[in-house]
Amino acid sequence: MKTSRFSNRCRIVLFVSALFSVLSFCRAEDIVLTSTSATYPYERGQWTAEQCAAWQEEYGPIRGINCPYPPCGAMTQEQAIAYAASLGYNSVRWWPSGGTNADDYIKAVEQWAGWADKYGMTVSPVFGFLQSYFSQSDHASALKNLENQVRKIIRHFRGDKRIILWDLWNEPNLNDDDTKEMMEWITKMVTWCQQEGCTQAITSSLIWDGGVSTNQAAASGGRLLRENVEKLMDVHNYHDYSCQDGFNNETPTMYARLKKISDRPIVCTECMTRTNGSTYARTLIDFAKYNINFYTWGLSACDPNWEVRWSRSTFYNWDPMFHNALYADMEPYNESEPQWVKNYQFQGDFGGAKTGAEYTEIWSSRRAWKWMQHGESKGLYCKTIAEAITKVNTHKRDKLYNTIAVRINYASWASSNSAAKTQFNSLLSAAESAGMTVIPILLTSENLRSNVNTLATYAFNFINEYYYDRRIQAWCILEQTDAIGNEENFKSNLETILRKARYAFQNQPLFCAPLVTEGVMPDSTQTDVANLMWQLSDVCGFSASDASMEFLGRMMKHYHRPIFLLGNNSLTEGMQDNHVNWATAAALPSEDVSNYHFNIFFDNNEDRSSRWPGWKAWRWMNRPPTRGLFFSNISSAISMLEELNGTGSPYNSICVALDFRGYRSSQETFFADLENLLSLAAANGITVLPQLLSDTYFRMSAYALTEYVENVLTRYANDTRILAWDLYNKLSSVNSNPTKAESIIDDLFKTARATGAQQPIFMTPSVSVNTFPSGFDPIASLVHGRYDGWSRLAYGSGSVDLCYRIWCMSDVICYTSSQTSLYLGWLNAQAAKFGRPLFCAEWKVPTSEAPSSTMEIFKDMHISWFANGTLDEEMVREFTYRPVSTQH
């Protein structure tokens, strides 16, 4: 830029011109001119305490979000920002495009600022071009070019209230050979911004070395260099993905560290990672105490693959989601999380606030039902580990039971941790060899006489030791074994234990089991001891010798969660209807145990217009894994079923393409054939997935298509023989008419839902994966932070818009595949971003690869599959899902 002296008159003209530019964005009383410089007439110093307070008061608490990208090309960036605003966010932080071209960068900021402002949001741009300059060999030249770009950007946006702060450098090196020079560059950048009269907060993400011990340590080396530069900033800016560290001591120690540097507003510009327990609830509760502004990371499951932690790949199953607020269909990962954002406010006087989250955050119903994707748990109940090992060995061969609930002797564990752990590990090994999982019962009522903090630490340590162990089915934190004396004291102690136990990130559900006696009834609006225990649990457990049908029905109605019964003496009416998992203390008849299977769960389904909520879709799939065959017509399916004639099959479902032309020719014959198919399938223990339409009928009238769908679904709306409905298979695979295709999607879904069908409704889009380039690693390309996914999909004669539209309207997510396992896995990784049960309605096994490779993906990702052609029967019979287990 030019630095030669101008005449006083010329400077005045420029000053007035720029002042009017500033006034277009802010009020006159907001402008503070402190410069006496002729070269930089707008120069200002670091903000004073009063200016910081005015900034915070004007904008209020920042409820920000990082990089709210759309899930795929079917949604625009503006639409994604609008979604973020609807969740309660009021600011956007991101890395504008443009690189080292100042004009392009300015254009990108203008565009995003315009979108954000339209929805009542501010923006916080990051100078993402820093590394491009710093990586150049000629640092003197690079620094000059950087100065030109920074000054031009700041001048352009001077006075723009849409921008709330500038983040000069995101996460410079913590402590290496480059740290010192990076700090020198940032110091210069602060000066340039001040000289250009930057009216927004100047800050930089220098503090990103979190951890309680780090925050408490004295500053030295690279940390001292960074903290000295931090003193130059208008507001403090830090990153922390470990807010739960030290039982939520991380935030107060970080707060103390920053306030020691200088007393300024604090913004945590990156936070929220669920897999280590740094959830919305835990994080924002403590931020509110300490008046901390925030930006969580990620809006929806999308191509950057932020659903999994650093270095992990979305090619494999995951839960919980690492970053992001929403699934790809823009449904919340957890329905409670948007409320934490919308309701966020500073608490002001936090001097006496306790550290730690007062809120005990439980699993969402969706996650609880997703965990149960293996069918019924039929278990044994034991009071000692020794008894459990004996029973496991007794039933190792008969395969009647698949889990065992066992009391852990707290006294033994407390007195001899090593010996107790050895015994417990022996049980886990024995159970694994018998094909059984374990439900440890950590505490019983008599243990509550011990110190509550000691009990809480014990529960935390136990779960933390085995959090990643797939042999654990669930954790019973407390089994109530006798009457409760002081209820208020009991509730307080229980909450303390659960609160600390949940700091151990668990892959398995936690629950309490109240003793159900006469008069105890589930009611989510009540806070008696039993209902409080259920409200604090991921799944609903209870201890009783039996349970009435009324009790079980109320449990499901009020809590919508899987049910675990401990210590039952019989299998009573209503248990199968309400999907009760149990662990018996009695010697039940073998036939009763063998025949215990969940009945299909039907609701009143009063809502005849909306897609199923996610938890309901997962609850529907609370059954043994679907192992199916695909048939292109009813006659071939009937022939197979007649050949079986009740002799048994390794398959438990079939997908059958129905003949719409046959329906139009003779409805009587059509329904007679369909009824014959359903009857034969039921006689062989097989469910049916009908495919109603395909592109063969694309040119038929809308009336003809909807009348057909309405007639078929109405007739079988409550039929337990139907697994699900595929309304249209591979739409636009050969026909290209986007307008008509969209109309078909909307009309058929509307018609199908109006029938009140009790089974999940979906369509299968035409979607596959383009050929990978030579040497391409699909697993590595889906690692956290790698921008890849939807761009490699192909849609036949359709489009990404049609595929996305279909999956957003479907109760379950379905695709077909004839590609090898790596391609199928890639496609499935995109489908899994919708957070719903996955179906492969037609799997054509490629001749170039053994089916076992794809079967491994089906096991890991919990996919219901239908093979086009028979497979090895033993492989099919042994097919089962692997529990989702996520490391910290």
Where are these regions (language model features)?
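Bacterial N-terminal signal peptides
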Residues: 13-22
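Active-site mouth of glycoside hydrolases
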Residues: 32-233, 261, 275, 303, ...
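Boundary at the C-terminal end of the N-terminal hydrophobic targeting segment
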Residues: 26-30
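Active-site neighborhood of phospho(di)ester-bond hydrolases with catalytic His/Asp-centered motifs
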Residues: 205, 238, 266-270, 513, ...
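Glycine-enriched alpha-helix->loop->beta-strand junction motifs that scaffold or abut catalytic
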Residues: 231-236, 262-264, 290-292, 534-540, ...
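Substrate-binding surface in catalytic domains of secreted glycosidases
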Residues: 243-257, 545-552, 818-826
